[in-house]
UniProtKB/Swiss-Prot annotation:
Subunit: Associates with pre-60S ribosomal particles; released from the pre-60S particle very early in the cytoplasm.
Keywords assigned by UniProt, alphabetized: Cytoplasm, Metal-binding, Nucleus, Ribosome biogenesis, Zinc, Zinc-finger
Family of this protein: Belongs to the ZNF593/BUD20 C2H2-type zinc-finger protein family.
Zinc finger regions, C2H2-type: 56-80
Subcellular location: Nucleus; Cytoplasm
PANTHER family: ZINC FINGER PROTEIN 593 (PTHR46095:SF1)
GO cellular component: cytoplasm; nucleus
A molecular function (GO) term: zinc ion binding
Domain of life per record: Eukaryota
Annotated InterPro entries: C2H2-ZF_Maturation_Protein (IPR051879), Znf_C2H2_jaz (IPR022755), Znf_C2H2_sf (IPR036236), Znf_C2H2_type (IPR013087)
Primary subcellular site in the record, as a coarse category: nucleus
Summary of the function given for this chain in its UniProt record: Involved in pre-60S ribosomal particles maturation by promoting the nuclear export of the 60S ribosome.
Protein name stated in the entry: Zinc finger C2H2 protein ECU02_0310
């Protein structure tokens, strides 16, 4: 009789669940923080602890990359395009919220 791999499946599902939870907790910056970073455009100095020395950075996604080639591939990806679209959109204001409810 073949050996069951239920322990492996359980381990795998736990890893996936923990990975998703960690991504939710320590995910990318909020949109308003990203907009502030883009407006300030601070120069990033060399940091040996960051990938690529901190030179290849995507502001919208808050990610560092090893080379410029990898950064360009990332900028062509769908997750980056979605995030960039979110950043470009105008944020809702209190006035918009009141209008939607019908207070004004």
């Amino acid at each position: 009789m073949p050996k069951s791999d239920t322990k492996q499946k359980k381990r795998r599902s736990n890893k996936n669940r923990l990975r998703i939870k960690r991504a939710r907790l320590f995910g990318p910056k909020d949109i308003d923080q990203v907009k502030e970073d883009i407006e300030s455009q601070k120069k990033i100095e060399y940091d040996p602890e960051l990938p690529g020395g901190g030179h290849f950075y995507c502001c919208e996604c808050d990610r560092h990359f090893i080379t410029e080639k990898v950064l360009m591939e990332h900028k062509r990806s769908n997750p980056h395009r979605r995030r960039a679209k979110e950043v470009r959109e105008v944020a809702h204001s209190q006035r918009d919220a009141e209008w939607a409810v019908g207070l004004t």
